Structure formats: C-alpha cells, structure tokens
C-alpha cells in the first residue's frame, strides 16, 4: 500500500453498478503496481470496482442488493453506520447521498486493507473501525441510520446482536437489515446441525414472523418487510478475483432449490426497523 502511486485528477463514479475510479494516462509501471496490489488482496467478496482500466469483478454483484435497498433510505445530512461493512463498497455508494458522517465497522484486516486500497484514490471522508457489532453500544456515538447486511445469521445470539444495533441508534433511528430466512408462517428458525451452504458459522435462519419477534424483543417499535429475494448465480459466483468456492458449489448439484446439506437454498429477507422517538 505504501508504494501505491499518488495520482492527480482522479474522477469517481458512484452511479453505476461499479464504484469507478478513472484517471488520465499513467506510466505502465504505475498501472502494474496498482493491479498487482489489487490482486494481492484477493478474495474480493463485495464490489465490483473499476480501477482505471481493469475491473475488480468481485464474488458478489453487490449492486443488486444496493439497488433493492436504495429506494428505502435517505442518508442526506445523517450519521450513518454500516455494520459488517466488508471492503466498503456499500459505503462508497452511500457517500453519494452526502451523509453527515459515514462509519464502517468490520473486524477483518483484509477488508480494511481493501477499503484503504480503494480509498487511496477516492479520498472519501469515511471512518473504518476494526470493530464488530458487539462494540457498537460502547462506541460513544449514536447513528441516525444503521445498515446490518449479511451479519445476523453469523451471530450465535441474534437477539443480543439486535439489542446492540438498537442501542447504537439515536431516537427515531432506522435499521436496514437483511438476513437469510426460511418460508413459513410459524414463529420458528432453522438451526443447521453443522453447516449451511458449507458455512460452519450460520446459527439461526428465521421466518419473517420469528425475525419480527426478535426485533420486538430487542426494543424496536415497528418492523417493515421490504423484499424477499432468492440468491441466484447471477449475484454470487466464482470470478478470477476470489480464490475459493462460491454459490454453485454450495448448492445441491441435482437441485439448486437446496443446499449441499439438503436445507432450503439461500433466500434473503430485507427489513426496515424503527426505534421510537
């Protein structure tokens, strides 16, 4: 990272699917340094990013989730946090809405380094904290809007996690959350025995009704269902920018409606929860 060139005249595009960084002519050795640095930071899970003339084609086409959520939030002049922010893709997109402040929480050093790589060129006023959701309530700052995307099912105590999110919100604040879910009208959650889609850190996958009750127990005043979407191979797939398996390897080869373990295939629910004023 210390050897990345300092480029002048960098233009930033935040409106398309990719977070895009463009500049004029640079020396070939500078371009190669930038490319090799990006390649050294695999796997790139979230994105995509255009970096000059090459595309970091991440495992997840994160623009799909952002496009689904964007009609449901207004970040202008608000204090915003992204919990489990990964490499900052969503935060760079959010920056375009001119929030008052933007803070990401993620304990992964690799994610922080990827963020630093991209922000070396963008120079966005975004804070990245090497912290988890459990540090939110003691952080010393309350947020108007908190995003928590793809985190809850990795937590062994989901209600405590939701309580931490609640305590991190200012009065009248909003939580935008997505999590794996199962279909059904009962107040239940799937608890995988060992693994779900080859992941050993998936603990509880609720119905919408169970998730609503968790949020109620955490203190939220109201819960709004935004969308339910099945994860497809057009959204999560292998690319040259990851060094591991992806969704196709996690599903039953005979039926993509089930995981390799026989559980229902990944389906996500997106909700908005409100803290009382």
Curated annotation (Swiss-Prot):
<feature type="binding site">
    <location>
        <position position="46"/>
    </location>
    <ligand>
        <name>carboxy-S-adenosyl-L-methionine</name>
    </ligand>
</feature>
<feature type="binding site">
    <location>
        <begin position="133"/>
        <end position="134"/>
    </location>
    <ligand>
        <name>carboxy-S-adenosyl-L-methionine</name>
    </ligand>
</feature>
<feature type="binding site">
    <location>
        <position position="268"/>
    </location>
    <ligand>
        <name>carboxy-S-adenosyl-L-methionine</name>
    </ligand>
</feature>
<dbReference type="GO" id="GO:0016765">
    <property type="term" value="F:transferase activity, transferring alkyl or aryl (other than methyl) groups"/>
</dbReference>
<dbReference type="GO" id="GO:0002098">
    <property type="term" value="P:tRNA wobble uridine modification"/>
</dbReference>
<feature type="binding site">
    <location>
        <position position="60"/>
    </location>
    <ligand>
        <name>carboxy-S-adenosyl-L-methionine</name>
    </ligand>
</feature>
<keyword id="KW-0819">tRNA processing</keyword>
<keyword id="KW-0808">Transferase</keyword>
<dbReference type="InterPro" id="IPR010017">
    <property type="entry name" value="CmoB"/>
</dbReference>
<dbReference type="Pfam" id="PF08003">
    <property type="entry name" value="Methyltransf_9"/>
</dbReference>
<comment type="similarity">
    <text>Belongs to the class I-like SAM-binding methyltransferase superfamily. CmoB family.</text>
</comment>
<feature type="binding site">
    <location>
        <position position="84"/>
    </location>
    <ligand>
        <name>carboxy-S-adenosyl-L-methionine</name>
    </ligand>
</feature>
<comment type="subunit">
    <text>Homotetramer.</text>
</comment>
<comment type="function">
    <text>Catalyzes carboxymethyl transfer from carboxy-S-adenosyl-L-methionine (Cx-SAM) to 5-hydroxyuridine (ho5U) to form 5-carboxymethoxyuridine (cmo5U) at position 34 in tRNAs.</text>
</comment>
<feature type="binding site">
    <location>
        <position position="65"/>
    </location>
    <ligand>
        <name>carboxy-S-adenosyl-L-methionine</name>
    </ligand>
</feature>
<protein>
    <recommendedName>
        <fullName>tRNA U34 carboxymethyltransferase</fullName>
        <ecNumber>2.5.1.-</ecNumber>
    </recommendedName>
</protein>
<feature type="binding site">
    <location>
        <position position="153"/>
    </location>
    <ligand>
        <name>carboxy-S-adenosyl-L-methionine</name>
    </ligand>
</feature>
<feature type="binding site">
    <location>
        <begin position="106"/>
        <end position="108"/>
    </location>
    <ligand>
        <name>carboxy-S-adenosyl-L-methionine</name>
    </ligand>
</feature>
<dbReference type="InterPro" id="IPR029063">
    <property type="entry name" value="SAM-dependent_MTases_sf"/>
</dbReference>
<dbReference type="InterPro" id="IPR027555">
    <property type="entry name" value="Mo5U34_MeTrfas-like"/>
</dbReference>
């Amino acid at each position: 990272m210390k050897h990345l060139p300092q480029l002048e005249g960098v233009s930033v595009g935040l409106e398309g699917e990719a977070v895009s960084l463009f500049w004029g002519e640079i020396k070939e050795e500078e371009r190669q340094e930038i490319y090799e640095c990006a390649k050294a930071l695999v796997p790139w899970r979230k994105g995509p990013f255009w970096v000059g003339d090459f595309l970091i084609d991440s495992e997840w086409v994160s623009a799909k989730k952002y496009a689904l959520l964007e009609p449901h939030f207004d970040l202008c002049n608000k204090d915003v946090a992204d919990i489990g922010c990964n490499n900052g893709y969503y935060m760079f997109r959010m920056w375009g809405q001119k929030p008052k402040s933007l803070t990401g929480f993620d304990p992964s050093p690799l994610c922080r380094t990827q963020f630093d790589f991209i922000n070396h060129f963008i120079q966005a006023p975004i804070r990245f904290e090497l912290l988890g959701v459990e540090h939110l309530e003691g952080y010393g700052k309350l947020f108007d809007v908190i995003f928590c995307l793809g985190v809850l099912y990795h937590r062994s105590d989901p209600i405590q996690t939701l309580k931490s999110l609640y305590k991190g919100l200012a009065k009248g604040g909003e939580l935008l959350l997505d999590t794996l879910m199962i279909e059904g009208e009962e107040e239940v959650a799937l608890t995988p025995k060992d693994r779900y889609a080859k992941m050993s850190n998936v603990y509880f996958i609720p119905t919408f009704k169970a998730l609503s009750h968790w949020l109620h127990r955490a203190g939220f005043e109201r819960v709004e269902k935004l969308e339910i979407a099945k994860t497809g191979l057009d959204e999560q797939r292998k690319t040259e920018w990851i060094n591991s398996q992806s969704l196709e390897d996690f599903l039953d080869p005979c039926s993509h409606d089930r995981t390799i373990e026989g559980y229902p295939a990944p389906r996500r629910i997106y909700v908005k929860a409100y803290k009382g004023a």
